[in-house]
């Protein structure tokens, strides 16, 4: 027996159970840590007296693994894992990934494409009448008809595609608690239609009254304006106070999204984090080297949920929501003490964060009664006048953590919302952040420098980041430290023409930055930016949006972020010419790339081939700090 939930029939029998209440199927390896949704849901059910068996990464080629525990008494629960299975498998260029951080040994290929659909179909093959509920990120973000980047088409709701009975969206503690109770009372899953934070399919004549009717699946497939309209309608109803039921017809069925679940209270969130997690992968993976995904979170603490930053390319607003829920100081310190007792703890708490590390308060006072503003952002392009800005509680917690026995340092590695820092008139937190909580590098996310692109991203304008950067280095210098900002930057986001991409190159040049890794925009399911990518429309204004889509242009935009690399030279030359920025081609200090040079043999054949050139060029200007120190991990 281990202290993990049973993963074999023998382990289940050793608990005195022959038929589990639930079989939980996940596309990830089994890691019993609160950063993994599977751990939270299974431990929560266990705490409520239910028996749960875990089926992690089953072999989907036959039904054998799906019958390992027999048919559960109440339901199968299915998730694709911590991230969408297609994102786990493919890069933004649609190339197959060679590793999977959520699989044993980092091995790729242990989950199928579209894992939720595949797993549900295998369950139906084995047990046609079994109750199936789906949840997690893959199900949550695909709950409506959605553009699928990998198929380059609009797919129906994953609820219709998978054949499951119920879909739980968002953070699922309330939903699974209510569902388990109703199932235990003998209510058939097909009759469970009133749980907040769930979706179900019904006949059109049984559609609940008063819902917001989106354009149907057939409409959004053929009409991009209808798709954009549906996206806005769906986003506008995601607040737990103001959100209404959302309807979208799929053929002869009506998809019904009930209003969002109510956020956990602080007491409820604390209780979730008190569950008896082992904080590590199941020992069955030890021989394969464990599960790499645990490394980033093993000595980290999540202190909040939700994000009112509301970036258009981010899925958090549609999954966790815009409301901030925070754990108590006592809960955070309790987890930190557990971390310090782990045998491989070296004295360093790696991160104290969440979707956004430095949010502890609601964005404003009105939202408790009136809900979040519809169609508006709290921080972009400028902070709302009603925004509450206060880092004092977060700072107090960090100070308490630093004083714990065995703790040498407490870091905040990422997730700092720099515009929120700059909105704070008291810079005590900023100074202490730089003095105590930066491990040489602080990762922040300006994402771009063009305000045209930043507006499409839903991010603050670049002037805010520049002010933050200036102040960061002033404080760093005053402390006698050598610390650096590592900016996350994104190429090819909707709105980014080649001209806007060149502006990003010039920013990197002027700041002496040589990013070793860059990120192309990835059109993941359900986001506003993905809607822009597919429709070439802004769903909030219905105005056209320029979208770089061809592999050539996306490669050029990516190359401009690493213009100094010899292998990018030809792409950079092409990009600058197409952008009308030949002034940046040359050997002067302000140029990005040297002009094409002809060899002696090529000169003799110039009339025959005017375009022949070598791959020569000048070395990039020495950066203000080395690329090693600016490595993005």
Question: Positions of the model-derived regions?
Answer:
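Conserved SAM/AdoMet-binding glycine-rich loop
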Residues: 24, 59-60, 338-486, 490-494
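Flexible glycine/acidic-rich beta-alpha junction loops that bind and position SAM and/or redox cofactors
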Residues: 84-93, 141-143, 173-178, 202-208, ...
């Amino acid at each position: 027996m281990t202290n993990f939930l049973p993963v074999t029939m023998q382990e289940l029998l050793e608990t005195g159970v022959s038929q589990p209440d639930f079989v939980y199927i996940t596309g990830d390896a089994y890691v019993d840590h609160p950063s993994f949704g599977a751990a939270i849901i299974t431990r929560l059910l266990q705490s409520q007296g239910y028996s749960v068996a875990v089926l992690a990464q089953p072999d989907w080629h036959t039904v054998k693994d799906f019958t390992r525990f027999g048919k559960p008494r109440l339901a199968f629960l299915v998730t694709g894992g911590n991230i969408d299975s297609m994102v786990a498998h493919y890069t933004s260029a649609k190339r197959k990934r060679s590793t999977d951080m959520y699989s044993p040994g980092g091995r790729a290929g242990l989950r199928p494409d579209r894992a939720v659909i595949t797993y549900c179909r295998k369950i139906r093959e084995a047990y046609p009448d079994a109750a199936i509920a789906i949840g997690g990120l893959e199900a949550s973000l695909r709950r409506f008809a959605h553009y699928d980047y990998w198929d380059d088409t609009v797919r129906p709701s994953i609820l219709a595609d998978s054949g499951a009975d119920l879909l739980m969206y968002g953070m699922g503690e309330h939903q699974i608690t209510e569902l388990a109770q109703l199932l235990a009372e003998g209510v058939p899953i097909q009759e469970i239609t009133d749980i907040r934070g769930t979706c179900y399919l019904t006949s059109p004549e049984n559609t609940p009254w008063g819902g917001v009717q989106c354009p149907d699946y057939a409409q959004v497939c053929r009409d991009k304006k209808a798709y954009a309209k549906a996206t806005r309608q769906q986003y506008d109803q995601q607040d737990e106070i103001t959100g209404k039921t959302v309807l979208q017809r799929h053929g002869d069925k009506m998809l019904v999204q009930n209003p969002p679940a109510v956020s956990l209270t602080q007491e409820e969130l604390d209780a979730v984090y008190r569950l008896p997690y082992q904080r590590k992968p199941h020992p069955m993976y030890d021989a394969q080297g464990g599960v790499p995904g645990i490394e980033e979170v093993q000595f980290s603490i999540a202190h909040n949920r939700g994000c009112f930053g509301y970036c258009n390319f981010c899925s958090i607003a549609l999954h966790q929501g815009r409301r901030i829920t925070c754990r108590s100081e006592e809960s955070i310190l309790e987890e930190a003490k557990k971390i310090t007792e782990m045998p491989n703890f070296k004295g360093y708490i790696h991160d104290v964060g969440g979707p956004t590390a430095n949010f502890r308060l609601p964005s404003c006072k009105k939202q408790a009664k009136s809900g979040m503003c519809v169609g508006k952002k709290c921080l972009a392009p400028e902070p709302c006048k009603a925004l509450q800005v206060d880092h004092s509680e977060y700072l107090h917690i960090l100070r308490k953590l630093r004083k714990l026995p065995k703790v040498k340092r407490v870091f905040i590695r990422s997730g700092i919302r720099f515009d929120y820092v700059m909105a704070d008139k008291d810079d005590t937190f900023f100074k202490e952040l730089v003095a105590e909580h930066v491990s040489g590098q602080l990762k922040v996310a300006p994402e771009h420098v063009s305000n045209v692109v930043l507006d499409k991203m839903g991010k603050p304008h670049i002037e805010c980041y520049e002010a933050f950067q200036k102040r960061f280095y002033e404080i760093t210098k005053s402390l006698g430290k050598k610390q650096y900002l590592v900016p996350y930057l994104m190429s090819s986001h909707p709105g980014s023409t080649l001209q806007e991409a060149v502006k990003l190159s010039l920013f990197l040049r002027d700041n002496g930055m040589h990013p070793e890794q860059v990120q192309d925009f990835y059109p993941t399911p359900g986001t506003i930016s993905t809607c822009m990518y597919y429709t070439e429309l802004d769903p909030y204004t219905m105005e056209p949006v320029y979208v770089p889509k061809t592999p050539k242009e996306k490669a050029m935009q990516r190359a401009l972020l690493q213009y100094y690399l010899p292998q990018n030279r030809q792409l950079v030359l092409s990009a600058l010419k197409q952008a009308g920025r030949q002034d940046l081609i040359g050997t002067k200090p302000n140029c990005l790339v040297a002009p094409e040079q002809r060899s002696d043999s090529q000169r003799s054949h110039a009339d025959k081939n005017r375009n022949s050139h070598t791959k020569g060029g000048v070395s990039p200007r020495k950066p203000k700090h080395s690329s090693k120190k600016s490595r993005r991990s």
